[in-house]
Amino acid sequence: MKSEVIAEAARATLDGSIPFPEVVRRLMETGVEYSHVDYVALQTSFYSATGEVIKTPINYEKLPPVANNLDRDALRSAILDSQQNGQPYRDFTERAIKAGVQGYIAFLRGKRVTYWGRDGEQHTEWFPGAKPDNA
């Protein structure tokens, strides 16, 4: 994995300068298999298939505390707003945290994201068009 490519993709995600599909493409090209966004530690960890890990900060200020319970409807609404209306990542982050998301893992090869709340409750969302018929 190339740390400079990952750092640039992370920065571009936070400031909204490139769309999510382009971020995924760049990360996969540099060997990222999955990433873990941690809203408590305010960092994202990027993992390769060989076990290499690169961490970048989430440098947003004044984020709300993670809500006590995972509100799947509010989370799904935030996800759809990002997918369909190009919602800025900062806004998505705030809405996800208010919906009780403590963190999530984006499985790039698997084309899905699993979100979880403070009590371990989970929600998995497929990348647009990637959900198999049997899922």
Name what the model sees in each region.
Residues V113-A135:
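Glycine-rich, aromatic-bearing surface loops/beta-hairpins
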Residues E52-Y104:
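Short, solvent-exposed interaction modules
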Residues V40, S48-G51, R109-G110, G117-G120:
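Short acidic-glycine loop/turn motifs at beta-strand connectors
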Residues P19-K62:
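Acidic (E/D-rich), amphipathic helical modules within compact regulatory domains
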Residues M1-V23, M28-E29, L70-Q87, K131-A135:
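Short, flexible domain-boundary/linker segments around small modular repeats
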Residues G100-Y115:
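Short, compact, well-ordered microdomains
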